[in-house]
Amino acid sequence: MTPVVALVGRPNVGKSTLFNRLTRTRNALVADFPGLTRDRKYGHANIAGHDFIVIDTGGIDGTEEGVEEKMAEQSLLAIKEADVVLFLVDARAGLLPADVGIAQYLRQRNKTTVVVANKTDGIDADSHIAEFYQLGLGEVEPIAAAQGRGVTQLIEQVLAPLAEKLEAQAVDSDENVADDEQDEWDSDFDFDNEEDTALLDEALEEDQEETDDKNIKIAIVGRPNVGKSTLTNRILGEERVVVYDMPGTTRDSIYIPMERDGQQYTIIDTAGVRKRGKVHLAVEKFSVIKTLQAIQDANVVLLTIDARDGVSDQDLSLLGFILNAGKSLVIVVNKWDGLSQDIKDNVKSELDRRLDFIDFARVHFISALHGSGVGNLFSSIQEAYQCATKKMTTSMLTRILQLAMDDHQPPLVNGRRVKLKYAHPGGYNPPIIVIHGNQIEKLPDSYKRYLSNYFRKSLKIIGSPIRVLFQEGNNPFAGKKNKLTPSQLRKRKRLMKFIKKSKR
């Protein structure tokens, strides 16, 4: 399960700056849910090789009378569901009553907390952070988030060890997600050698065999009241299986195993399968953290949309997180029954307009309440999963690359054409294709999109994102001095003597 890091503290202590540092972007609004989480930000980060969900909880205006009264409900939820809390304080402003109140709240919750003293640039950090030890939360980590100072040390000495500890405790850690930023290849590997490429294909095939006959995890996600629980119950009701919880898997998400046509599935219900009478607030039905974790843990995601409301900004935010996580996708438009033909046409037109960037995903129009169209979902789920784990070989991908270049050659850069040499598989779930060549960094984005679409069409990948990575060919002479042969040295010596004589 992906660990969750919550950034808490008073306003203007640098939480958003640290958020951007950890997520390595200046606008990392992976999932922003207006009206539900207000100014809370959710982002995905890869820290020291470990995946995290990072939350900026916004400023907490606590007072010495009681910080709990001033904490927003979503801040409380974020702290409750976080694995690690980074408590930011302002080293320049010193210890304030609000800091003491927040620290007291965190101690009461017995949450793993790290005090981070920000804005230590240009001051004596040791003397300024000393007073924060009286908070009783252990070591204080000094940083200057705006300049990036101390952030690497915070990652290496605090977050990375915590991630390793959490991963060691995880019960279900069979995710097979490839990280393109850490996709490294041996520079000595010869892709022109058939024996070497055969070994690579064999190794990747072994990885793929682990996904065969696997229990497919399906996450049903969406905004509140779009019919997620109804769809879950309809799927289970059709199959007449006994629903039972699997304790210890994830916080409030319920993992429900089922079987259909000999294939094992696990439905991840982010609604918690609670009785309707016990749910008083809409916000109780929808936890951002539970949804993001369910997406990370799933093989196929069913993004459920209310046909009567259309595609909202919240739907697009969830969609962005699904694509960034590299998950297979099926779009489910619920509550399709009872709509007039004009409204149905308008809904389809809006879907085509707002979701044109994910034309690879199947769209199903269903009624979870009445069951119409629900049974057809599994064919698309199977198709998306099989495409995500599709077998690819180096020779196959290189042949497709050559056909793509024959149809449309790479552009000229400074009078020289970008040369693409070969392609090989880089992983599955999602399919990753690595292309090697020269002057790769000068290849325009338009041509990269062309190659991505060409590979998708040639491989017939539907329902799954595809990642095409580009790597510059290694220069065998890079970093080496030009070493002359003995005959060249003698020739150079004679030439130097001739030059000296001519100058006399």
Curated annotation (Swiss-Prot):
Family statement drawn from the similarity comment of this UniProt entry: Belongs to the TRAFAC class TrmE-Era-EngA-EngB-Septin-like GTPase superfamily. EngA (Der) GTPase family.
**Function of the molecule:** GTPase that plays an essential role in the late steps of ribosome biogenesis.
Sequence segments annotated as region (Disordered): 171-190
- Which lineage? Bacteria, Pseudomonadati, Pseudomonadota, Gammaproteobacteria, Pasteurellales
Annotated SMART domains:
AAA, RAS
- The gene designation is der
Assembly mode? Associates with the 50S ribosomal subunit.
Per the database record, which ranges form the KH-like domain? 390-474
Q: Which GO terms describe its biological process?
A: ribosome biogenesis
EngA-type G domain ranges (all copies): 3-166, 216-389
- Answer whether the UniProt record assigns the keyword Translocase to this protein: no
Fetch the InterPro entries from UniProt.
Answer: AAA+_ATPase, G_ENGA, GTP-bd, GTPase_Der, KH_dom-like, KH_dom-like_a/b, P-loop_NTPase, Small_GTP-bd
Return the protein name. GTPase Der
Q: Where is the composition biased (Acidic residues)?
A: 172-190
**Organism encoding this protein:** Glaesserella parasuis serovar 5 (strain SH0165)
Q: Which GO terms describe its molecular function?
A: ATP hydrolysis activity; GTP binding; ribosome binding
- Which keywords does the record carry? GTP-binding, Nucleotide-binding, Repeat, Ribosome biogenesis
Gene3D superfamilies (alphabetical): 3.30.300.20, P-loop containing nucleotide triphosphate hydrolases
Residues recorded as binding GTP 1, renumbered to this chain, are 9-16, 56-60, 118-121
Q: Fetch the NCBIfam families from UniProt.
A: GTPase_EngA, small_GTP
Q: Where do the annotations place GTP 2 binding?
A: 222-229, 269-273, 334-337
Q: Tell whether Repeat is among the UniProt keywords.
A: yes
